[in-house]
């Protein structure tokens, strides 16, 4: 299996620290609002990666944090007239509700920054003791230039970074920082009513970057197999995590850095951002969009690629899901009949070849498009066999099992996919389908067509097969 490592800018063979196990940390949301589709894209991308590791037999220790204190949290709590902990709890629950709807597996652990304050203080003190950090009027800053490898992950020169940073340092920080490029590890309390914790440097709260260094190494060890997040986190967040963690431990922090692509919106493929006021929340989308369609749409694009959120692309995803559903329904319908099966060597070979193509694609840095193409190209032959006079039932049964496993990698539950929406008119539909079957048996084509039209007006789609007529709702 090969992964594209942002640190080296190339694909590398995946070699876990412990054979058969994967330690994986993914930056979670700052919980001051409902998650938008950019947040969902990252969560779904890394959930798909996690699921494929599990499909391959790995045990995955997956840690994803909640940032439950920072400037955004404080500002939003003030605007809503609530406390930071109350705001965090509300949106953590909203996050869990949205991710459950999208069938995102819950993390092995969801640590919260505010629950890790003692560990954060200890981590910062170690950096001070080693000369990598310094206290200034209640704040603590990281001495960036002391870390020789700074800028490696984002492929940037530290002198250029320093020049850019000097233009963004406010007057208040100017007198405290040794260098404009230094960043905050601990922020001293600015107002008496501002959320804060006691520390050796006075009351205050942790900086954003230190939170992830502490939580990842506390729960996964000094060196991680994989660290994931959006491309927007590559700098400065992940760059700063490396500087903090490696300065403290003296060890390589992460072996494989993975970053997912951005989400664009609409026909113009405009980058989604709060500043452009084009953010769409999952909470709002799911009022009108089937969660399985949204999940499949987001999972069907390779994680490093940009993805465009639009009604047309959602509709295309729904159509592909419909093809998978029809194939599974056809197989199940055929397996339930009493006819004797007939082995088909070509179909058995196709199942084996499709499995190999699917895994080869996913082993190549999780190339989901090629994996889906392999499945999609197998459907016509499978459907044809399911509708044949004598089907290869064993191969059909195996393909259905494989397809369920493949779709599970994409976060789809086959049982939910195949579940028919119960309606008050189901019995009526069954009766009309039976009447039409009788009319066809009697070669009463006019009556058969009349019943088909009646069912169509009721939103029912019919499919005639040698084994009988199947129906589904549009």
UniProtKB/Swiss-Prot annotation:
Location of this chain's protein in the cell: Cytoplasm
One Pfam family linked to the record: tRNA-synt_1e
Co-factor(s): Zn(2+)
Gene Ontology MF, one: cysteine-tRNA ligase activity
Protein name stated in the entry: Cysteine--tRNA ligase
Any one GO BP annotation for this protein: cysteinyl-tRNA aminoacylation
Family: Belongs to the class-I aminoacyl-tRNA synthetase family.
Motif extent ('HIGH' region): 29-39
GO cellular component, one term: cytosol
Binding site for ATP: 274
UniProt-annotated binding residues for Zn(2+): 27, 212, 237, 241
Keywords: Aminoacyl-tRNA synthetase, ATP-binding, Cytoplasm, Ligase, Metal-binding, Nucleotide-binding, Protein biosynthesis, Zinc
Main location per the UniProt record: cytoplasm
Motif 'KMSKS' region per record, residues: 271-275
NCBIfam families in the record: cysS
Cofactor binding note of this UniProt entry: Binds 1 zinc ion per subunit.
E.C. designation(s): 6.1.1.16
Reaction catalyzed: tRNA(Cys) + L-cysteine + ATP = L-cysteinyl-tRNA(Cys) + AMP + diphosphate
Gene: cysS
Lineage summary: Bacteria, Bacillati, Bacillota, Bacilli, Lactobacillales
Assembly behavior: Monomer.
